[in-house]
Structure formats: C-alpha cells, structure tokens
Amino acid sequence: MSTMLIAVILLTLLALFFGVLLGFAALKFKVEGNPIVDELEAILPQTQCGQCGYPGCRPYAEAIANGDKVNKCPPGGTATMEKLASLMGVEPEPLNAEAQSQVKKVAYIREDECIGCTKCIQACPVDAIIGAGKLMHTVLTADCTGCDLCVEPCPVDCIDMLPVGQNLKNWNWRLNAIPVTLIQETPHEEKRG
C-alpha cells in the first residue's frame, strides 16, 4: 500500500473515533436548560435591544425566571408583559417608569450622507433597514422598534433617532377607559284599551 493511502485511512479512522467520542461526551455531559427560560424567551420580542437593562432577550428571560420583574420590555409593550406575568403566575404591573417615560423613537437615515456600508443593516435585530452595499439605506418605520442598535456602528453618523409623533394611525384611543353609564330600562305600563 502506498503511504498516501495509509495516511488517508489513518486520518479517517481518527476522525471517526474522535467524532464518536465527541458524540458520546455531548450526550453524557449534556446540560439541561431551564424550560421556563425557553418559554419566557419565546414570548419576548427578540429585538436584543438591551432597553430592559440586560444584553438581550435570553439574559432577561433568565432574570425573570430568577425573580426579576416582568415589566421591563418596552418593545414588547403591555401585551408581552401580561403574557410574561401569566406564565410566571404574578400580577401584571404597568411598564416600569423608564419604559413609560420614553417617547417611542424610530431610526431615520439621512440618505444623502449614507455611504451604503450595510453596518446598520447587520446591527438591526428586526430587519427594519433595507438597502444594499454601496447604495443608500432606508428604515421601515413600521418595523423599527427604536432599539438604537443601528446608530453606533454607522461610520458616518447619518442615523438619527426621531420621536414618533401622534397621528390618527398611531394614537392610543383608550376606548376601554371611556366612562360608560348603564341605564336600567324600566318596564312600561301596558296600555289599557
């Protein structure tokens, strides 16, 4: 047999041996994750924005599982907070003061200054920025969560975070908060004829 064939066979056998060894080790030393953390993470919006004070949604889910409050996710809003509270069996609370006091903002790219580097596209966790290399980029404001992660990587500083103004499309009407007075109907007397 040639030395080349022997080397190939030997390396194949070594790769097979170490593959089986790694597979066995992966099964033997598998670390089971906390299933509640996985459920909490599935509820969170996965923007990885850090507005909750944690570096991403997974660390915040782990903190909630360890007893942290469920009202720290501004992009998720009240609906996410209520789902988290029901899963954890705690009373829903209003969003924390920081989340409520923040005016919703969206990214705005000054397109005449954009060099098309795509760094903001790569940084956006929700794919709210569209564009291509060496072409200008723009933000889909309906999809932007205002996480601010696209501002820092921009080399020409052409991204601003602008507050979203109230208009008919995004106004919070609070229809369930309008006071309604129920009037009981009194029975009418039958007409005598």
Swiss-Prot record:
Signal sequence coordinates: none
Manner of cofactor binding, per the entry note: Binds 3 [4Fe-4S] clusters.
GO-annotated molecular function: 4 iron, 4 sulfur cluster binding; electron transfer activity; metal ion binding
Binding site for [4Fe-4S] cluster 1: 49, 52, 57, 73
Sequence ranges assigned to domain 4Fe-4S in this UniProt record: 32-90
Entries under Pfam families matching the protein: Fer4_21, FeS
Example GO BP: electron transport chain
Annotated SUPFAM superfamilies: 4Fe-4S ferredoxins
PROSITE patterns, sorted: 4FE4S (PS51656), 4FE4S_FER_1 (PS00198), 4FE4S_FER_2 (PS51379)
UniProt entry tagged with the keyword Cell membrane: yes
Cofactor(s) needed for function: [4Fe-4S] cluster
Function noted in UniProt: Part of a membrane-bound complex that couples electron transfer with translocation of ions across the membrane.
Sequence similarity: Belongs to the 4Fe4S bacterial-type ferredoxin family. RnfB subfamily.
Xref: NCBIfam families: PRK05113.1, rnfB
Protein name: Ion-translocating oxidoreductase complex subunit B
Organism lineage: Bacteria, Pseudomonadati, Pseudomonadota, Gammaproteobacteria, Alteromonadales
Gene: rnfB
